[in-house]
Amino acid sequence: MIVNFLNYISETLQSPIIYEIWNIFLIDYCYLFYHYVFKIDFTNTARWFLLHSIVNMIVVYYAIDDVKLCIQNSSECYKMPWNDNSIKVYNYAFLLHIYHCVFFKLTKDDIVHHTLMVGICGTLCYLLQSILSSLALFFLSGLPGGIDYFLLYLVKKNKLKSIVEKNMYTILSAYFRSPGCILTTFIGLNGISDYYNNGRYYKLLLLISTLSLIFWNGQYYLLKSHESYIRKSI
């Protein structure tokens, strides 16, 4: 019985989702351990920004092959199923935000964001299981998020002026993140046409809902970044 139990624990720990949540926890623990050992003051906000930045860059690493596939096969990537890397991309992005909900204090904006983009859009992406989700997450969370959250971390550590971060994020949003969300939506339109013509209305509804949220997210946070920069500039 003990051997069977140990085998079960071993198999569970080797499952992708456990591996990824463990990695997120380990990154966070190393940050806490370092500051505790060397008695360095820190804020949970700075801790979250750095964790978010690191995990976002992990998302970029695993998403890059799917991004290439989507661009090279834009007419049919919406129906290409998840591969091992796609699962990692989804798990890291999804679990990071669950981790945020459990271990950090959320703002009202965080709650809205997590409800729409994690609770709803995350579920839709899981039901679709298309590599198109990797393309979306590359732009939604991956590269622009990895850069900006590191800049926000530097701001919290008084290594960078807030106005500089806001200016750089406005540029990232306008010329990379928002266009990337539009590109993802445009590529996904091929699937809408296909599913409608072939009467696959369940898939059609899932895809329309997912693409709508991706498009909205890109443009909404583009607007928010500009508003924030303008307020800081005045």
Report the location of each language-model feature.
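N-terminal signal-anchor/initial transmembrane insertion module
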Residues: M1-T107, K203-I234
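Multipass alpha-helical transmembrane domains of eukaryotic endomembrane proteins
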Residues: W48-G199, S228-I230
